[in-house]
Amino acid sequence: MSDKTRRTIPLRRQLIGCAMAPLCLAVTNITLAQQDEGLIEEVMVTGSYIRSTSQDEASPVEVLSNDYIVNSGAVDVGELTSKLSVSSGAENNPDSFTSGETQGTSNVNLRGLGLTSTLVLVNGKRQTITAATANDGSVFVDTSTIPMAALERVEILKEGATATYGSDAVAGVVNFILRKDFEGVEFSTGYEEISDGGAGKYDLNLLAGFGNDRTHVTLAGSFISQDPLSSSERPYTTENAVSTLGRSFLTLAPGGVGTGDYAGSYGFLETVPDAACTANGGAPGAGFVPDGAYGPGTGGGGKCGFAYGPRFNIVNKEEKQQLYGNLTHDFSDALSLTAELGWTHHEVKDNPQSPSYPALTFPTLLPGTAGSPFSVPVRWYGRPLGAEAPSPLAPRESDTLRASLQLDGEFDSGWSWMGALTYSENDREVYQPDTISSRLSAALSGAGGPSGNESFSPFDPSANSPELIEWLSYQTFTNKKTDLTVADFVVSGDLFEMSAGPVGFAAGAQWREESYSANRNELYTQSIDPATGATIPVDLIFLGGGLPIDESRDSYALFAEANFPLTSSLEANLAVRYEDLSSDSSIDPKLSLRWQAADWLVLRASASSAFREPSLVQVYNQETSLQGLVDPASGSSSALFVRVNSQGSTALEPETSTNFNMGAVFTPTDNLTFRVDYWRFEYEDVITVENAQGKLNDNPNGADIIRDSAGTLSGVNVAYLNAQEVTTDGIDVTADWMIPSNAGEFGLHLSATHFLSYEIPCTAANDRGCTGDSGVQDVAGYFNYDNFARSIPETKVNATADWRVGNHKIALLAFYTSEYETSRVIPDALVDRGYSQDIDSWMTLDLQYSYSFNLGNTEAMITLGGKNITDEDAPRLFDAANFSYDPKHHDPRGQIWYGRIKLAL
């Protein structure tokens, strides 16, 4: 079992390579493999196209080595990257309420600048975005498609790199490096289980490699199966997940009911709850119209809501299969081939939902119809199926394919060249249940069911036949596809000599073509009225659907970089990239300096510009999602899920940013390295979809706020726009300390990120310094429910301590997230139950023990471990009708124990 070093250069060229270090990423904890005396590997590192042997830390970097990956106990990439201190506001934990479409995916959000602002690479090559879209309109590369069985390390460049890589590398780059030139066969399997709730997860992995001096093949495969964990196992997470739309009625005239469950006299616009609200699993609440709102005897009453929270999962039942292979072949000493092929199939198999969604048409029921006992018309505020019905499922299925072919060569002059063609695609299917609106209307008037003569009663669920319910029900289907084709060509070598050494140089060109399509089944597809141009709503009571889309575009780029050894201790690197987009063009430079101030001290600084072009989704997409909103006009703190209709725009401009980084690397001993960096991003024309809650708060009766005739909220229209600016800065600190001793080898690693500020424009008066819609607000340390920023705890820290002696290894990992605030008004009743503006700080501990031994000619390792071993609950948060914790930063699963075995043949 080994990974061979394939490309070597004479040791005398090491000094030349060190002088050529440009925007290179120093690979912490990775040493250059020396094969024979006088030979050392030459590598191309993330952030540069100039080959170099330098390990000097010219750029801010964090590297997750293979050893760290093993110590983490992570089964998939999302679990690994979710704990990065430099990532804030990513979506790696399942959440049906605020990231329903992205379930089963994972991503990275460097600096909290948005999922779209982090460039994800696989072996230095671009990967297609997933076809899933986040609630805020973000698109991203699904990192869960990265095969863990083949993952060697993760390199994280924590500064803008548009000058090298082009669009999207605004906040930085995450480069997943996969195994190649592996020899032998390695089998591993593991099982983990949540202590409280019993949901298990197991995986099978196989890694194999074989070859000769010229040709080598590496193959990997894995299977992962996850059992579900219902939110009912964590009651605190859903205690506020209550809809105001359960089963209630609003009288449209004064009247009464003589006998039966609804007997009594009612005034004008009085809310009447389900007569058996509590018995039917409902949640009593205040009426829709305040008492006396339209004069004496009007309004009042109480409604019957629906507690939907326990219906949903915290963890869904999922299965994932992955295959990956690469082939390398040396045609000669000056020409080599690398080919890769990868495939991931991922299914979310259950994903339970509410029995049915509420009817946002709010039907009016006349006396004598739909089983109404009232003598006057009433408006129905509710859902066809409630607590008496089972939960339908909303599965998701995704296939991702990636293929890459690369040729590397050398000219007689010593210059190198690289040409590559990479293709990747994602095909995603999403199912979601709903009720057909026209059929419900027919059934309410007595013309429903297969025979056309059945009546649906909202007053007595037992009166509705299974055949009628099936006739009303509909399973929506959405198929979204993305693909990306990239052609790269790069040349690199020594340009000319300076007194301190040669000038390293690289130049190249890139062509990209991407496409995005979305199609839905018939009833879920919106259409356009040819006469007015208006969107015709779909024939469903709740879900809004979307328009079909099939768009593509291409771009071209030219780039160059050079590294100048100004003196024996000072280097300057200059890079520039020109990109010709389908809608615009951009020139982005980058200047970085590295000064070896002393043997133990490196000072570094960089300044660059960056850009990101609007995604095809942001430009062309039009669809409707569901969001839980609190209506300030209702006078209630309760939330209800309504349609949020988002509209893309062809007028969007690219986002631009100016980035700065200053840092120092201290190496007082060979075993201790300490790094500190100050970073700053000035981000302009940030593309975002309008925040529906913020828009509702700013103007509850605006033109884009949709209400029925009684004023009940049913939808909000939002648009993509270049309306925002972000200025953020902070401090990164990392440290590595190796302590050899007679008792074994001790290792300590620390990674911390602290936001000094995260400033965005004010839109309305709030408690974050805004007095109106002018000026800026600092949203670092806030949950940010009412603006486009995601939740931003000011400080995140990861620390690892490990001890190795003989065949034994113990690792302790600590993860800390600082407290932050909600800014949301909390009802007095919830304050009495312990809710507050503060979201508590959170620290969890993971522990792992491994023992290695031989079984004949087989190397074996047994690993036992625990995650969150002190069983810390996710901090409590009031987020209206959503989960009562922040899934962007906290994990409610609690304590998890696991065991693994690995066999190397």
Q: What is the predicted role of each segment?
A:
Residues 135, 229, 239-244, 279-318, ...:
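Surface-exposed, low-complexity loop segments enriched in small/polar and acidic residues
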Residues 81-126:
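Extracytoplasmic beta-strand/coil segments of soluble accessory domains associated
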Residues 125-158:
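Short acidic/polar hinge/loop motifs at secondary-structure boundaries
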Residues 77-80, 108-109, 141-144, 168-189, ...:
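N-terminal periplasmic accessory domains that precede
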Residues 36-38, 181-184, 197, 214, ...:
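Short loop/turn motifs that connect adjacent beta-strands in outer-membrane beta-barrel proteins
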Residues 437, 756-757, 813-826, 852-905:
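C-terminal beta-signal and adjacent terminal beta-strands/loops
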